[in-house]
Amino acid sequence: MAKRGDELEKLLGPLEAEVVRAAWAAGEPVTVRQLLERLNSGRSQQLAYTTVMTVMNRLADKGVLRRHKQGRGYLYEPVASDSAGLAVRGVVRDFGDAAIAHLVDEAKSDPKVLKRLQRLLEEE
């Protein structure tokens, strides 16, 4: 059986995946310092502030985290609530309309999936 989080590490590196999981666990926008404290709690080898800041900035540049200016620093929050959401965002970002068209074509081949997709669209 696959270890929980393996899907995320397929999309990102191990440290990036750990940062994203910590941001999900926070449940609200966080500063670099707040996430650093969360990551370092119970950890024998402490991460440096600059390491976490660099990783969070790279994740924001990749579109995985959203960055909001607050005072002299930033607040960060995940753009998706799970690894599937991140994967879909990446596919849509990389392939655009073609990815959406293929998704709809796949949904058309299974009436249950098509109904679910329609229901989800109506909820938005």
Identify the residue ranges that each predicted region occupies:
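Short helix-coil junctions and helix-kink-helix linkers
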Residues: 37-47
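Amphipathic alpha-helical dimerization/coiled-coil segments
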Residues: 86-124
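Short beta-strand "wing" residues that participate in macromolecule-binding interfaces
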Residues: 67
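Glycine-centered, phosphate/nucleic-acid-interacting loop/turn motifs that mediate DNA/RNA or nucleotide
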Residues: 63
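Short, cationic-aromatic polyanion-contact patches
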Residues: 70-89
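Short acidic, hydrophobic short linear motifs in intrinsically disordered regions
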Residues: 29-39
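Short alpha-helical segments that sit at the start of domains
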Residues: 1-22, 26-29, 93
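Short, hydrophobic-biased segments on the C-terminal half of alpha helices
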Residues: 53-57
